[in-house]
Design a protein with these regions (language model features):
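Periplasmic solute-binding protein
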Residues: 1-10, 25-29, 117-131, 217-229
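Glycine-centered hinge/linker elements that transmit conformational signals in sensory
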Residues: 2-41, 82-89, 101-109
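Short helix-initiation/N-cap motifs at beta->coil->alpha
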Residues: 38-53
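Long, aromatic- and glycine/proline-rich binding clefts that accommodate carbohydrate-like moieties
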Residues: 97-113, 160-228
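Extracytoplasmic/periplasmic substrate-recognition and gating elements
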Residues: 33, 74-172, 207
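Beta->alpha turn/N-cap motifs
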Residues: 44, 61-66, 85-87, 124
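Alpha-to-beta junction loops
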Residues: 52-62, 79
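A ligand-binding cleft/hinge motif common to bilobed small-molecule-binding domains
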Residues: 61-77
Length: 230
């Protein structure tokens, strides 16, 4: 993350037209050979329905699929999951040349056994805000609601329900699989699920989603333009 994942930190030019991006698109295109014919038109709800029906051998997602397999309509996959934080690579991008080079201790100091892992914190998490123009009673009510939703008593239930979109985020939720075992996960799966999330969060090489003013414009306008010209 410190290196700048989305763009050159000095020039703000998107890092897209290089061998790393080309390889990523090639791999992404390759996965299409193994998906359903309508894959390009599927949204998140569609893919999760296929997942719960037992039609997915591999799903790249947030942490939601873990508790989603507890749903009544997910009997085809209940207890049959295995989670990992992210796949890695034996090559990394040389930013000076734009080419891929083999992993070594210098260009990938956090690599493990010659493989560089870079879990991506996609989306970046939920946030709540209170309108400063609201009257005080409304502000107090909004604050009380946000506080209630985030306190351990409520959030520790919500993270075990896939439909909430909440994933474990409090230390108490990440330190033990007990919440998920209580919700119905097999012990081994609960340990695997929490372990995968912790593996990503604790990675020294985690790539954070963009958190700058105007990020939406950058990703939907500037980046799209660069990709079209690449």
């Amino acid at each position: 993350t410190a290196q700048g994942f989305h763009f050159n930190n000095a020039t703000m030019k998107p890092i897209v037209n290089n061998a790393g991006w080309k390889k990523a698109f090639e791999l992404y295109k390759e996965t299409g050979k193994y998906g359903p014919p309508e894959e390009l038109n599927l949204d998140i709800g569609d893919t999760r329905a296929l997942f719960k029906a037992g039609r997915c051998g591999l799903l790249v997602e947030w942490g939601d699929p873990g508790p989603l397999q507890l749903d009544d309509d997910a009997t085809a996959i209940k207890g049959k999951l295995y989670a990992i934080s992210a796949l890695g690579s034996r090559e990394v991008l040389n930013r000076a040349t734009g080419e891929l080079v083999p992993v070594n201790n210098v260009n990938a100091p956090h690599a493990i056994d010659g493989i560089n892992y870079a879990p991506f914190a996609a989306f970046g998490g939920w946030a709540g805000a209170v309108n400063k123009g609201a009257d005080q009673k409304t502000k107090d009510a909004a604050y009380a609601f946000l506080s209630y939703m985030n306190q351990s008593a409520q959030s520790s239930v919500d993270v075990t329900i896939g439909a909430t979109g909440y994933n474990p985020y409090r230390l108490s939720q990440l330190s033990s699989p007990d919440l998920f075992v209580k919700a119905g996960m097999p012990q081994a799966l609960a340990e695997n699920y929490i372990g995968a999330i912790n593996g990503a969060l604790n990675s020294l090489n985690m790539a954070s989603d963009m958190k700058i003013p105007g990020a939406q414009k950058y990703t939907s306008v500037v980046l799209d333009t660069e990709l079209a010209l690449s």
